[in-house]
A protein has these predicted regions:
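Secretory pathway targeting signatures of secreted, lumenal, and periplasmic proteins
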Residues: 6-68
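Sec/Tat-exported extracytoplasmic proteins
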Residues: 26, 69-70, 152-155
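Surface-exposed amphipathic alpha-helical segments
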Residues: 22, 118-165
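Short, hydrophobic/aromatic-rich segments at coil-to-beta transitions
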Residues: 2-7, 32-35, 81-91
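Signature of long, low-cysteine stretches enriched in small and polar/charged residues
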Residues: 63-118, 162-164
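Short, surface-exposed beta-strand/loop "edge" segments at domain boundaries and coil↔beta transitions
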Residues: 42-49, 54-58, 97-101, 126-134
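Residues that act as N-cap/strand-start positions at coil-to-secondary-structure junctions
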Residues: 3, 10, 30-32, 72-74, ...
Length: 165
């Protein structure tokens, strides 16, 4: 379910403010049904918001795929606190440097769908050498700053909305 109230978009256990100028990607290939994917009009940035289920810690997940050797870290893994959730984040790029990424994995109490984890994923397409090392700038871009800063874990939000009706 997606529900909009007072400028916030609500999903199963989360809410967000979606700023003007971002495009919803309806046919996104994802692993979780509640995933929302947006991109900028120029297609240079993609952002994915995805609740999911896991038994691993954020450290285990991030270190697991980074150790595969397909990516180069652009930062150390660091602690994050996002919308009432604690986790880990990292900036990295692919080996060919055609994309730079920011990934954040956080945990929350299991919801009624069995989900207990949240992924914030941002991808930056590097088209020229001048585009390199720009992924960290995205965190200060006004549109993404609004969206990222608005992420809130809201348990039982669907039930609360239904009761208000």
């Amino acid at each position: 379910m997606l529900y909009i109230k007072n400028g916030r978009l609500y999903t199963q256990s989360f809410s967000y403010i979606i700023p003007d100028g971002l495009c919803l990607v309806p046919d996104s290939i994802t692993t979780a049904p509640d995933t929302l994917t947006f991109e900028t009009l120029d297609g240079k940035f993609l952002i994915m918001l995805s609740p999911y289920e896991t038994e691993k810690t954020p450290d285990e997940e991030l270190n697991g795929f980074l150790k595969m050797g397909c990516h180069k870290m652009m930062s150390d893994i660091f602690e994050v606190n996002r919308g009432g959730m604690i986790g880990k984040g990292v900036f990295y790029r692919d080996n060919s440097w055609s994309y730079e990424h920011y990934e954040e994995r956080t945990r929350y109490p299991e919801n009624e769908e069995g989900q207990n984890a949240f992924e914030l994923y941002i991808e930056h397409e590097v088209q020229t050498e001048a585009d390199r090392n720009k992924i960290q700038d995205i965190m200060n871009h006004p549109k993404f700053k609004v969206l990222i800063g608005s992420i809130r874990y809201e348990p039982d939000v669907c039930q609360k909305i239904t009761e208000e009706q």
